[in-house]
Amino acid sequence: WIMGHIVNAIGQIDEFVNLGANSIETDVSFDSNANPEYTYHGIPCDCGRNCKKWENFNDFLKGLRSATTPGDSKYKEKLVLVVFDLKTGSLYDNQANDAGKKLAKNLLQRYWNNGNNGGRAYIVLSIPDLNHYPLIKGFTDTLKQEGHPELLDKLGYDFSGNDAIGDVANAYKKAGVSGHVWQSDDITNCLLRGLTRVREAVANRDSGKGYINKVYYWTVDKRASTRDALDAGVDGIMTNYPDVITDVLNEAAYKSKFRVATYDDNPWETFKK
């Protein structure tokens, strides 16, 4: 999965997909009542990026729905996965469940069109704080209560705080999650970070008894760091430059080992070599 980083304006969806992304990451900020409010990152963000583009969350969802609904004039067949980077740092811990409920209602109505031919992309809820695990239950309970448990098939989870793998496993246990898990390992492109934790996550994924289904690494903007991440065995790379990742995937050393995921590839299944 080539994951376009900080895609917060509707116009950027086309831009990143045209550069080779089959997945995007979108920031979601919340108001003081735990309602999802804007797709906005703000300063600081990655070096060389404009971090100030934004939409109202509900407007973005409509644009995203168009881009991922077959038959729509704006449809992009390649776009199959969306990571919502939930900026829950502004919330109190006891608001997490509420935030999950409200997020689910927004997506149900404006993205999934109440289950009636809505957007088809797989969705990952990425949460920065392990203490906010109740957000997951708020979200999943709401989908069930609203009569759409089938949409849980489209839903995955990620804790993005670079916590110890064991602590993340415990948070999932508390949240009642036993699958559909992506594990991120991340640092801004302005700094360098080793691949130790990535390798640990890959080992957990491949052990057959870990909690991780997929591992992604960000932010990767250079050819050398792309090769390092691929050599470590990641499933996804988040980038500001999807064309760089595409170029490396076309190199002889990687062409036979990796391909770009399509809608038919299940993002919740651990890939068996």
Swiss-Prot record:
Q: Can you tell me which family this protein belongs to?
A: Belongs to the arthropod phospholipase D family. Class II subfamily.
Q: Which GO terms describe its molecular function?
A: lyase activity; metal ion binding; phosphoric diester hydrolase activity; toxin activity
Question: Which Cys pairs does UniProt list as disulfide-bonded?
Answer: 45-51, 47-190
Where on this chain does Mg(2+) bind? 25, 27, 85
Class in the EC hierarchy, top level: lyase
Q: Where in the cell is it found?
A: Secreted
Q: Which residues of this protein are catalytic?
A: 5, 41
Q: How is the cofactor bound?
A: Binds 1 Mg(2+) ion per subunit.
Q: Name its GO BP terms in alphabetical order.
A: killing of cells of another organism; lipid catabolic process
Which keywords belong to this entry?
A: Cytolysis, Dermonecrotic toxin, Disulfide bond, Hemolysis, Lipid degradation, Lipid metabolism, Lyase, Magnesium, Metal-binding, Secreted, Toxin
Keyword check for Disulfide bond: yes
Lineage: superkingdom: Eukaryota
Show the catalytic activity: an N-(acyl)-sphingosylphosphocholine = an N-(acyl)-sphingosyl-1,3-cyclic phosphate + choline; an N-(acyl)-sphingosylphosphoethanolamine = an N-(acyl)-sphingosyl-1,3-cyclic phosphate + ethanolamine; a 1-acyl-sn-glycero-3-phosphocholine = a 1-acyl-sn-glycero-2,3-cyclic phosphate + choline; a 1-acyl-sn-glycero-3-phosphoethanolamine = a 1-acyl-sn-glycero-2,3-cyclic phosphate + ethanolamine
According to its UniProt entry, the function of this protein is described as: Dermonecrotic toxins cleave the phosphodiester linkage between the phosphate and headgroup of certain phospholipids (sphingolipid and lysolipid substrates), forming an alcohol (often choline) and a cyclic phosphate. This toxin acts on sphingomyelin (SM). It may also act on ceramide phosphoethanolamine (CPE), lysophosphatidylcholine (LPC) and lysophosphatidylethanolamine (LPE), but not on lysophosphatidylserine (LPS), and lysophosphatidylglycerol (LPG). It acts by transphosphatidylation, releasing exclusively cyclic phosphate products as second products.
Q: In which tissues is it expressed?
A: Expressed by the venom gland.
- Tell me what organism the protein belongs to: Loxosceles spadicea
- The catalytic activity of this protein is classed by the Enzyme Commission as 4.6.1.-
The cofactor named in the record is: Mg(2+)
Protein name listed in UniProt = Dermonecrotic toxin LspaSicTox-alphaIA1iii
What GO cellular-component annotations does this UniProt entry give? Answer: extracellular region
UniProt-listed Pfam families: GDPD_2
